[in-house]
Amino acid sequence: MEGGTNDGAAVPGNGAGTAGSIFWWLKNRCLGRGLCVDPARDNFRTMTSLYSSIHPADSVNLSTRTHGAVFNLEYSPDGSVLTVACEQTEVLLFDPVSSKHIKTLSEAHEDCVNNIRFLDNRMFATCSDDTTIALWDLRKLNSKVCTLHGHTSWVKNIEYDTNTRLLVTSGFDGNVIIWDTNRCTEDGCPHKKFFHTRFLMRMRLTPDCSKMLISTSSGYLLILHELDLTKSLEVGSYPILRARRTASTSDMTSTSSDTRPSSSPCHNSDLGPLFEKHMSRSSQREGASPRNSLEVLTPEVPGERDRGNCITSLQLHPKGWATLLRCSSNTDDQEWTCVYEFQEGAPVRQVSPRCSLRLTHYIEEANVGRGYIKELCFSPDGRMIASPYAYGIRLLGFDSQCKELVDCLPKEAGTLQVIRSLYSHKDVVLTTKFSPTHCQIASGCLSGRVTLYQPKF
């Protein structure tokens, strides 16, 4: 924790208590420490230590290379299947344990396949530049379960709320669309437009589905708090919780239409009435955030304070503690990977609340493969980050010991530590993914090769 305080030491005034005391036990329990909270924690710690011995193991090559670049990788929740989204309309399926090819969905879509999302161990969804989403069943891959129509431009990513069984998609048309998979038929699923913003790049849900994060090519990050997917958000129907130009300096909170940036991704509506609505609701609820309240941020990016940037990739910590961004400068001459901690709790002053995100760690990336989005990811326990780096990948940690984020939060933003660099491709790596169950990483590159990495002793 901050200041390098040991868990067992008594800290005056912070209520931590001494080792073995009830306050010490409660503090560690709140942080998720101890077998009574997370029985898998020690297992994940052991698995993380194995990544220091990881090497390229196999390449899942095919006899023909017609699928083009690899844009996305996704494991099934039980780790038994690895799916690959490809440039040339195809989806590939592999057994990640044996590295054997299972099947090729040769005409999964009519254009590039951008993203794959498993709904459970057998059902998965794919989205494409052909503006559609397709649902598939691993038990019957000869045909799609159904095709979903609703977007008007390239569909770029898919999220899924396991509690409500609602599918959430976003695309370059600026729309976030909700699909009710509970009432899915061969003709599709009932759907509705949930949100719209300009310059949309990526959309993600936090693990508990309490927040939606949206990144934009104009450098803005939108956060919908107290998320309710059952309500569509039309212009003026949601309160603006916070709107800030920066995430680390002065409280430049927009309180009227005069202070809104001209390139703001919000709707073309005056922010003044929306802020007044929010403030009145906030006073009634004693500072609690209203449902679907919107926060607009410009995340701090090292080296980019005086220039615009594009947030090309967006991921969430598996425990919901932080968000992971890959940013590139508007001139495409720099790329950064940044980690931002969620700062929860009611603000001290509602008229000038603190920002929800704080930059904790960052690292500069190799500036190769310009114009292509590089998809990075967290490990299943959130201790490590796998990030595409030129013709390989880098494993990054919050410190050299791969501690959890909550155990090594710095007072000021620090550099991510390179745990291991792995180079096994002959072209620019575009995507990487950790297996949810095995000590394995997969990566895919621009020329279509998929490589698996496993420990070797």
UniProtKB/Swiss-Prot annotation:
Keyword Repeat listed: yes
InterPro entries the record matches: DCA10 (IPR039085), WD40/YVTN_repeat-like_dom_sf (IPR015943), WD40_repeat_dom_sf (IPR036322), WD40_rpt (IPR001680)
Pfam family, one: WD40
GO cellular component, one term: Cul4-RING E3 ubiquitin ligase complex
Skewed-composition ranges (Polar residues): 281-292
GO biological process, one term: protein ubiquitination
UniProt entry keywords in alphabetical sequence: Repeat, Ubl conjugation pathway, WD repeat
Compositional bias segments (type: Low complexity): 246-265
Family: Belongs to the WD repeat DCAF10 family.
Function text: May function as a substrate receptor for CUL4-DDB1 E3 ubiquitin-protein ligase complex.
Name of the molecule in the record: DDB1- and CUL4-associated factor 10
Organism: Xenopus tropicalis
Underlying gene: dcaf10
